[in-house]
């Protein structure tokens, strides 16, 4: 190796680049790390209107934008990488884990467990056991798992996955996309929908399925005809959706005060959040709903069913309700008490700050660095 003085010159093929900067008669040596290559594997965007695709795109967008000096992020490429991040559990991805080619550290993203599919998809009884075994077999093929729901950790441990192989990293949203709209824009939207300035509006969002509490949302609209209800979302999985035929009939002939706009664009969804006097998600079972983070980022007051998950991830920054009757009472309370509604709106801002891009970016960078280092051992 050629030398000049006491400073060796490294070739560019090595893991570190030696940058020599001359300042007067001094030589400053800066060591620059080689970028990590992260290969994302996901088919989530093939299915519109479901949260996994939104969470995936937000992460990839953030890393491309703000981590380009540390990471090279690729998507669905058959290449060598420091970390291969599996976002969905497609069978071809499962088979790829047995290949000898260097995929680096294999990371699995746990967006659901077999039990959470109940009330979402219509799975024939004879297939349920097969699906459960496949899901856990896929997760076991991973060298580390990331959960978006901290409640999943105990379930994974109970299924035989070592606790030290599981890390909780929450979802987040892009504040450039999800933000409040000016009052004049909100007024225009109300006019567009034929709603007066003082009409109280409750907005919900998500796939139309039993697990989301859509039955309670419909009943609330029937019991509160003076309130306008809007549910954005549809049947992302078509006829496989649990209760598809029944909900399809309701969507085709809803109560007069209930609007089903279907699966909408992010731009339209932002407008609906802006219209909301109250955002209501009456789900019985949730993973880590992107809709809550989106609504909070748009400063919509949040009301939810009282689930253990929310107590952990939202820390009281929402109105908890035990059942449909409590939801009904709370809606009437907020309609009559603007001060209480304003207080709930301030709590939504706390949620938005907690799950900021800046905070989560550093968490992901640290995580990928650690996992890549383990993969090199």
Enumerate the predicted regions with their spans:
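Short alpha-helical donor nucleotide-sugar binding micro-motif in glycosyltransferases
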Residues: 263, 271-276
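Aromatic "clamp/platform" in nucleotide-sugar-dependent glycosyltransferases that forms part
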Residues: 284
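Conserved donor-binding/catalytic core segment of Leloir-type glycosyltransferases
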Residues: 190, 196-212, 218-222, 230
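Conserved acidic donor-binding segment of nucleotide-sugar-dependent glycosyltransferases
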Residues: 316-326, 333-339
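Short hydrophobic beta-strand element within catalytic cores of glycosyltransferases
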Residues: 301-304
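Nucleotide-activated donor-binding/catalytic signature segment of Leloir-type glycosyltransferases, i.e.
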Residues: 243-267
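Glycosyltransferase donor-sugar binding loop
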Residues: 205, 228-245, 262
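Membrane-proximal helix-turn-helix segments that form the acceptor-binding/catalytic region
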Residues: 126-145, 248
């Amino acid at each position: 190796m050629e030398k000049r003085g006491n400073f060796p010159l490294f070739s560019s093929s090595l893991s570190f680049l030696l940058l020599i900067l001359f300042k007067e008669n001094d030589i400053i040596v800066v060591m620059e790390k080689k970028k990590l290559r992260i290969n994302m594997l996901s088919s989530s965007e093939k299915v519109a209107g479901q949260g996994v695709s939104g969470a995936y795109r937000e992460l990839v967008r953030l890393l491309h934008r703000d981590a380009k000096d540390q990471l090279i992020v690729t998507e669905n490429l058959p290449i060598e990488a420091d970390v291969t991040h599996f976002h969905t559990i497609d069978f071809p991805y499962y088979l790829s884990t047995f290949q000898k080619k260097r995929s680096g550290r294999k990371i699995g993203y746990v967006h659901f467990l077999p039990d959470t599919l109940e009330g979402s998809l219509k799975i024939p009884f004879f297939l349920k056991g097969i699906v459960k075994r496949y899901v856990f077999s896929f997760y076991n093929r991973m060298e580390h798992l990331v959960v978006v729901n901290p409640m999943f950790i105990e379930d994974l441990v109970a299924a035989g996955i070592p606790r030290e192989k599981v890390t909780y990293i929450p979802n987040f949203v892009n504040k450039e996309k999800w933000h409040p709209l000016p009052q004049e824009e909100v007024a225009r939207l109300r006019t567009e929908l034929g709603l007066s300035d003082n009409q109280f509006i409750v907005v919900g969002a998500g796939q139309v399925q039993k697990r989301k509490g859509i039955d309670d949302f419909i009943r609330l609209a029937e019991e509160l005809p003076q309130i306008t209800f809007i549910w954005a979302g549809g049947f992302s999985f078509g006829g496989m959706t649990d209760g598809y035929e029944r909900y399809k009939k309701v969507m085709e002939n809803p109560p007069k005060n209930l609007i089903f706009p279907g699966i909408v664009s992010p731009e339209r969804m932002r407008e609906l959040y802006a219209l909301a006097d109250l955002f209501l998600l009456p789900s019985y079972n949730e993973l880590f709903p992107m809709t809550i983070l989106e609504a909070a980022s748009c400063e919509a007051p949040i009301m939810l069913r009282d689930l253990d998950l929310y107590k952990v991830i939202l820390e009281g920054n929402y109105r908890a309700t035990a059942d449909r009757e409590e939801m009904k009472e709370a809606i009437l309370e907020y309609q009559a008490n603007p001060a209480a509604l304003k207080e709930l709106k301030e709590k939504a801002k706390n949620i938005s700050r907690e799950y900021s891009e800046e905070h989560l970016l550093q968490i992901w960078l640290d995580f990928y660095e650690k996992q890549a280092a383990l993969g090199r051992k």
